[in-house]
Design a protein with these regions (language model features):
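Conserved pre-motif C helix in the palm subdomain of viral-like polymerases
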Residues: 101-132, 206-232
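Active-site-proximal segment of RNA-dependent polymerases
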Residues: 8, 12-25, 116, 120-177
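Beta-rich nucleic-acid/ligand-interaction surfaces
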Residues: 137-146, 248-251, 281-290
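Non-catalytic, polymerase-adjacent accessory regions of viral genome-replication enzymes
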Residues: 1-68, 397-401
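Short, glycine/charge-rich beta-strand/loop segments that flank catalytic centers
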Residues: 57, 89-100, 132-146, 170-171, ...
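Conserved polymerase palm-domain catalytic core
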Residues: 149-244, 248-265, 282-283, 297, ...
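Reverse-transcriptase-like RNA-dependent polymerase core
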Residues: 69-101, 114, 190-204
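Right-hand nucleic-acid polymerase module
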Residues: 1-11, 108, 113, 117, ...
């Protein structure tokens, strides 16, 4: 099993050792080089936002400003400047509908997001270093493709895959209570100033983890770490994968799977969470001696797993075809292809590349869209965007020199 490696020594420039508990993390959060590196990580994909452009123009001054905010954010009783203290804003929720689901998202301000990135840069080696290797989603380098490869290896080995169990957590993010997460954090982080900084970030969310906050996904994953290891080590389940709040377990013994689901339900109850009522234990598909196929495929992480192949869920295929038809319609009307739509289409083709759905691609996609042409358009438009961005940056630098 490959465990996610994160070299904090390269990021923060200080020696780092894996420990049971960690101290002096607040000192790291106050360092200028850490704050600057957090900004570089934060700005990816957000360079068009005006507040980010303003911060980048005068980065050194903004780094000192964030440093002052963190230095003045301490528990009551410590001498600080109350005007410079970190004061989070109360956000209005944004409702987003995607893939048939309605999600409530909160968009943090640049200062909030910056401080969250500083916190995560320090928490990442602690959380990712001790995480269960087969927990995927919301960790860098651990997407659905890595989870798909893991389940494929189980099936190819042929051991411990007679029966499967699947379960989801009901409204996971909206039911996580921060006080429960904090108790778990206190065992690992022995730094009251650093914990107070996290407390301030979560001021307006005592009974939920806000979607849209960079800190939320890390704290949510940290909350389920102990349960992951219990399933594998205490219950001795043959195979176990967690994709954020979705559990997929495999074992030859069906009774063990039922006991595992009961244990998961009990532990979730202690954390004030609930398992969905649509949990299931079923026999994995196989061929009988008479040649008749029985059992079911496994549907997890957007993939459909069979003994000899891996397919994609229907709604993802429909989504790919819908975008292909949009691009085809724009080509027929002689309209310009939007860069975001082209990038989204090429990204979704990765699902087809890593599954046995090439025949579907030939019938439904190839006749509508020329993929090579789309890739050339992306390359050309990206060069144009980068050139204009470079020209704008040069103009701003010249203007600032004239002003000086």
């Amino acid at each position: 099993m490959r465990i996610l490696k994160y070299d904090i020594e390269k990021v923060t420039g200080i020696p780092w050792k894996k420990k049971k508990s960690y101290r002096y993390l607040y000192r790291l959060a106050c360092r200028e080089d850490v704050i600057k590196k957090a900004f570089k990580r934060m700005r990816k994909g957000k360079t068009k936002r005006k507040d980010f452009q303003m911060a980048e123009e005068n980065l050194d001054a903004w780094v000192k400003k964030i440093q002052e905010i963190i230095l003045n954010t301490k528990p009551d009783g410590w001498q600080t400047d109350p005007q410079k203290r970190f004061k989070p804003v109360k956000h209005n929720p944004v409702i987003i509908k995607e893939f048939g689901k309605t999600r409530v998202v909160y968009v943090p301000t640049m200062v909030e997001l910056w401080i969250q990135h500083v916190i995560v840069m320090i928490l990442e080696p602690i959380i990712a270093g001790s995480s269960y290797p087969m927990s995927f989603s919301s960790f860098p380098g651990r997407g659905s493709l890595k989870g798909q490869r893991a389940i494929r290896r189980w099936i190819e080995s042929g051991k411990g895959i007679r029966n499967f169990a699947q379960a989801d957590i009901r409204h996971f993010y909206s039911h996580i209570q921060y006080k429960i997460v904090r108790k778990k954090l206190e065992r690992r982080v022995k730094d009251n100033f650093f914990l107070h900084l996290i407390d301030v970030c979560m001021t307006y969310f005592p009974k939920e983890m806000p979607l849209g906050f960079y800190l939320s996904q890390w704290l949510a994953n940290f909350m389920l770490q102990e349960l992951d290891y219990d399933i594998k080590c205490k219950l001795k389940i043959a195979h176990h994968v967690r994709y954020m709040d979705n559990y997929t377990l495999a074992d030859d013994n069906k009774k063990k799977l039922h006991q595992a689901l009961l244990y998961i339900r009990q532990v979730l109850g202690k954390m004030r969470l609930r398992m969905k009522s649509d949990w299931q234990v079923f026999r994995f598909e196989y061929t009988k001696k008479n040649g008749k196929k029985t059992g079911r495929c496994v549907s997890a992480m957007g993939w459909l797993f069979y003994r000899s192949k891996v397919l994609i869920r229907k709604r993802i295929l429909l989504h790919v075809e819908r975008i292909a038809r949009k691009l085809h319609k724009k080509e027929e009307n002689g309209q310009r292809f939007p860069l975001g739509l082209c990038r989204g289409f090429v990204s979704l083709l990765g699902w087809i590349t890593h599954s046995e759905t090439y025949d579907w691609y030939l019938i439904h996609i190839k006749e509508l869209v020329n993929v090579r042409k789309i890739k050339r358009i992306i390359s050309k438009m990206t060069r144009e965007v980068n050139r204009h961005a470079g020209m704008e940056k040069g103009t701003l630098q010249r203007l600032s020199l004239i002003h000086i």
